[in-house]
Amino acid sequence: MALNLEDKKAVVAEVTAQVAKASTIVVAEYRGITVGDLTKLRAQARQQGVYLRVLKNTLARRAVEGTPFAELAEQLTGPLIYGISEDAVAPAKVLNDFAKGNDKLVLRAGSYDGKVLDVDAVKALATIPSREELLSKLLFVMQAPVSGFARALGALAAKQGEGEAAAA
C-alpha cells in the first residue's frame, strides 16, 4: 500500500524520534521471510525493548539525516528491517539470534556510537552481555567476599559456642 505524503511525514517523524533516543541501529535483509517468522521476531524485539520496523530506505535515510547514524545511509539498499534501541547490544542480539535460526534474515550493517559497523562487528556486539547482565555480575563479585567473610564469622562463632558448651 502506497503512503501519501502526510503518512510518510508521520512515519519519518516516528522513526526520527526513536533514532534520537537510540544508541544503536542494526539493519538486516528480510527477503523471503514468512509473516509468522516476522511476527515472532517482532515479539522477541518487543520483549527486549527494541523498536523494530520495516521501512522504505528513502524514509529511513531521511530519519537518520543529521544524526550520529547518518553514515549508515550508504548501507540502506534492498528490503531491510531496522532494529533501533537505547540499549547498545539489544538490537544486535535480537536480530543476530533470530538470524541463527532463520537463514532468510541476513544481517547487513549497524551503527553504534556514530560508527558504521560491518556484519562481523554487529555479531561481535551481539555477544556482549547486556547492561543488566554486567551489573548483576558486578554485584555478585562485590557480594562474594562479604558473604564469605560472614560465613567465616558464623563458623568461628559456632566453633567458640561448641568450645564453651564443652567446658561447662
Curated annotation (Swiss-Prot):
One Pfam family hit: Ribosomal_L10
SUPFAM superfamilies found in the cross-reference section: Ribosomal protein L10-like
GO aspect biological process, one term: translation
Alphabetical list of Gene3D superfamilies matching this protein: 3.30.70.1730, 6.10.250.290
InterPro entries: Ribosomal_uL10, Ribosomal_uL10-like_sf, Ribosomal_uL10_bac, Ribosomal_uL10_bac_type, Ribosomal_uL10_CS_bac
Any one GO molecular-function label of the UniProt entry: large ribosomal subunit rRNA binding
Domain of life the protein comes from: Bacteria
Keyword Transcription: no
Family: Belongs to the universal ribosomal protein uL10 family.
Function: Forms part of the ribosomal stalk, playing a central role in the interaction of the ribosome with GTP-bound translation factors.
UniProt subunit comment: Part of the ribosomal stalk of the 50S ribosomal subunit. The N-terminus interacts with L11 and the large rRNA to form the base of the stalk. The C-terminus forms an elongated spine to which L12 dimers bind in a sequential fashion forming a multimeric L10(L12)X complex.
Listed HAMAP family: Ribosomal_uL10
Annotated protein name in UniProt: Large ribosomal subunit protein uL10
Organism of provenance: Ralstonia pickettii (strain 12J)
Lineage: Bacteria, Pseudomonadati, Pseudomonadota, Betaproteobacteria, Burkholderiales
Gene that this polypeptide is encoded by: rplJ
